[in-house]
Amino acid sequence: MKVLAVTGYKPFELGIFQNDHPGVTYIKKALHRKFLAFLEEGLEWVMISGQLGVELWAAEVVFDLQLEYPDLKLAVFTPFLAQEENWKEENKEWYEFILEQADHVDSITKRRYESPEQFRLKNQFFIDKSDALLAVYDEEKPGSPKYIVEVAKKKEEIENYHSYFILFSDLQDIIEEEQWNDAE
């Protein structure tokens, strides 16, 4: 696997409203573990669309890993131009920081937001251009990742494509490990 599309919940879907929320640490640890395993399998590129939450946290994990794995690259393909224009200032700054550090940045539709169709096009693009999908997603709590997961499942039925998930139970395991380690 050379190209991994990464997505997941937006912060509000997880009840997270600040980047220093403890849940962010556990999500980033889970992403880090998955990325390490995929690096052993030849991972070269991580693709995100730049949405707030899991995708930008994944970008931060990639940047951390690049210190040890300099060949690992981050691509940000936004669904449309200026997706951040209605975000809070601190989120805009965080997003701009990610874009500045990314190895490749482009917009899929190359125009400003016009319709939800641009999100459908983004989902299709991500699945078409990647070898696998990693989603922080649990089918018991559908949310914004549901649509790209459905596209990935359709591709899995006809091609050699794989979807990997970080479930809430995986995050709970990490929390318990951390608590166990802190108790020792």
UniProtKB/Swiss-Prot annotation:
<dbReference type="Pfam" id="PF06908">
    <property type="entry name" value="YpsA"/>
</dbReference>
<comment type="similarity">
    <text>Belongs to the UPF0398 family.</text>
</comment>
<protein>
    <recommendedName>
        <fullName>UPF0398 protein Bcer98_1280</fullName>
    </recommendedName>
</protein>
<dbReference type="InterPro" id="IPR010697">
    <property type="entry name" value="YspA"/>
</dbReference>
